[in-house]
């Protein structure tokens, strides 16, 4: 029987509170790294294979480099190429 290539989807609420411990000029950059680390751990995949959508990137950077959100809801879709992370509600 042939196996189907299913893309698995999972919704996560990723806490970004630890980013507040970093200098203000590094916070949004660190928030993106925290998202990659979180998805890598929970989806069991290397960080290099995680793609961050432009909508998710804009949501993190919406208030600039100094004030990223304290949490973000992410829809992670696993495919053969890796994992794509999107903001929940963005299509």
Swiss-Prot record:
Domain of life according to the entry: Archaea
Keywords: Ribonucleoprotein, Ribosomal protein
CDD domains listed in its UniProt record: Ribosomal_L31e
SUPFAM superfamilies, sorted: Ribosomal protein L31e (SSF54575)
The keyword Ribosomal protein appears for this protein: yes
GO CC annotations, alphabetized: cytosolic large ribosomal subunit
Annotated GO biological process: cytoplasmic translation
SMART domains assigned to the protein according to its UniProt record, in alphabetical order: Ribosomal_L31e
InterPro entries the UniProt entry points to: Ribosomal_eL31 (IPR000054), Ribosomal_eL31_dom_sf (IPR023621)
HAMAP family in the record: Ribosomal_eL31
NCBIfam families: PRK01192.1-1
Protein name in the entry: Large ribosomal subunit protein eL31
Originating species: Methanocella arvoryzae (strain DSM 22066 / NBRC 105507 / MRE50)
